[in-house]
Amino acid sequence: MLDITYIRQNPDDVKEMLRRRQQQGDAPKVDRLLERDAERKAMVQRTDDLKALRNRVSKEIANIKRTGQGSADELIGQMKQVSDEIADLDLALSALEAEIEELLLTLPNKLHKSVPEGRSAEENVLYKGPVSFEHNLDFPVKNHLELGKSLGILDFERGAKISGAGFPVYTGKGARLERALINFMLDTHSANHGYTEVFPPFMVNQESLRGTGQWPKFADQVYHMPEDGLYAIPTAEVPVTNLHRGEILDADKLPIAYAAYSACFRREAGSYGKDTRGFLRVHQFNKVEMVRFTRPEASYEALEEILGHAEAILVALKIPYRVITLCSGDISANAAKCYDIEVWSPAENKYLEASSVSNFEDYQARRSNIRFKPDSKSKPEFVHTLNGSGLATSRLMVSLLEHYQTADGKLMVPEALKPYTGFEIIE
């Protein structure tokens, strides 16, 4: 959420940010927000004036009653009207503040000055790579669906029977390989990169979604259990960031870094016409998430560190990849800057997004009221929050299956995963 003071002082900058994000149509929201903010200011002033009047006259009434000099009936009647007006103003102010908050919640984050200009994903900018590793693929490569089916390790048909399209089933050594990936990533981030492991709930309340920015803008993408007021998490970013919602963090303990495995659930509304085969687009997938809470001045250094931690997984697995910087028209509404890590799919002959690494600056912290005190004499300030997929297993599995297959249809296990699988080949 943007700071209302920033919007008051920089309305043109906010509108320019909306233009860069290809959201020019939301510019009237800024004007409406400022109008409502001015109304609120006038309403608060009127309420304060009336309360001051009531306090002053109440003393006069008390003095009249104490001395017995004259009647206080007229003043009492006037103060009754004043109290009624104050009550009406309080109700109107509450409704107005709710409208202002809803408007604030719908505005996207500021963009960092280094975010490239662009209208869509086609204008994203290569940041690093391509990073290549040698794999002997001098034969027709099977895609992950063909290989997974022939080896008996993936079963999308039975997943569809159970739940519908987009819900994969891992079987036998495929299930073991998936678990190995998850454990390898968690161990790497906790042992080598300094993250504290968290195993969070997979369902959250609406306040948690609101805090990280998935609500209300992405409400159509989450699975909802209305009877219980709960939502299936689209990413572990939601519960892990909300661990500290409403808290003032100890400055001496910053940065705080968490790594968490979770299943992720996404409705993928609006995906009609996109490639939905196999792991390319699913409703349920596994992901290891990295979440960081930092001082504001340290957040962009932290962004590069988190990116490096995600890359380290791919380097260890020898999965070819590249890193792109998302342009202003493709970056998510919540992020001030974002990198995508894309893994190479030889069967699809294209790169597939496997990780996003984002700096939200104080956007989520303001929504979630997560603060810290720089020192004992300072007022609390908002932290900066960051997160990165480290990584999602679905598209990572696509690249792994395609790069580690053999000409005779077997699958070699990456060296880094052998201690976790207990086997070296799937056939």
Curated annotation (Swiss-Prot):
This is Serine--tRNA ligase. One of its GO terms (cellular component) is cytoplasm. The gene is serS. The keyword Nucleotide-binding applies. CDD domains: SerRS_core (cd00770). Catalyzes the attachment of serine to tRNA(Ser). Is also able to aminoacylate tRNA(Sec) with serine, to form the misacylated tRNA L-seryl-tRNA(Sec), which will be further converted into selenocysteinyl-tRNA(Sec). Pathway: Aminoacyl-tRNA biosynthesis; selenocysteinyl-tRNA(Sec) biosynthesis; L-seryl-tRNA(Sec) from L-serine and tRNA(Sec): step 1/1. Its EC number is 6.1.1.11. The keyword Nucleotide-binding applies. Consists of two distinct domains, a catalytic core and a N-terminal extension that is involved in tRNA binding. Keywords: Aminoacyl-tRNA synthetase, ATP-binding, Cytoplasm, Ligase, Nucleotide-binding, Protein biosynthesis. Pfam families: Seryl_tRNA_N (PF02403), tRNA-synt_2b (PF00587). One of its GO terms (biological process) is selenocysteine biosynthetic process. PANTHER family: SERINE--TRNA LIGASE (PTHR43697:SF1), SERYL-TRNA SYNTHETASE (PTHR43697). It catalyses: tRNA(Ser) + L-serine + ATP = L-seryl-tRNA(Ser) + AMP + diphosphate + H(+); tRNA(Sec) + L-serine + ATP = L-seryl-tRNA(Sec) + AMP + diphosphate + H(+). Homodimer. The tRNA molecule binds across the dimer. Belongs to the class-II aminoacyl-tRNA synthetase family. Type-1 seryl-tRNA synthetase subfamily. One of its GO terms (molecular function) is serine-tRNA ligase activity. It comes from Chlorobaculum tepidum (strain ATCC 49652 / DSM 12025 / NBRC 103806 / TLS) (Chlorobium tepidum). InterPro entries: aa-tRNA-synt_IIb, aa-tRNA-synth_II, aa-tRNA-synth_II/BPL/LPL, Ser-tRNA-ligase_type_1, Ser-tRNA-synth_1_N, SerRS_1_N_sf, SerRS_core, tRNA-bd_arm.
